[in-house]
Amino acid sequence: MASLNTLPTGTWNIDPAHTEISFVARHLMVTKVRGKFTDYSATVVAADPISDSSVEFTVQTASFDTGSADRDAHVKSGDFFDVETYPTMTFKATQITDDEITGDLTIKDVTKPVTFSYDFNGVATDPWGATRAGFEASGEINRNDFGMTFNAPLDGGGVLISEKIKINLDLEFTKA
């Protein structure tokens, strides 16, 4: 892991071609369903000290993709994201340390604080002269907190879909 102190100050824009925003939910409490969002934007304004930096993400909720058209259509419906009414979800950092970022996550007009742990993987210059920075982050939310409460109880206990959703981010930014 690189030292965050080596991140040059200034504006950094997400590189969607080298980034993945993914999630994991439990299905029937015995297996995992994985998916990702494919349409998003993000900007980091790195400052010194790092605690003065800003981070903002916008994700297009209709870009939700698990590889199952039927499941994706259900999750995009009013039972979950309601993409027609709430086309985006956003994250805005409120506190940044050397290994955690806390911010306001807004889904379906509900805003809750969320903390992600992260690793800064360093800075590199690509063959075309662009300066790039890489991060890995992970966190967890309770989907019920954001009004996504659809579920069904199971005969043996448990529920159809886990309330806790794990979020994983593999991020690459390009210096503006």
Question: How would you label these PLM feature ranges?
Answer:
Residues 1-176:
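Low-complexity, acidic/polar, glycine-enriched regions of mature
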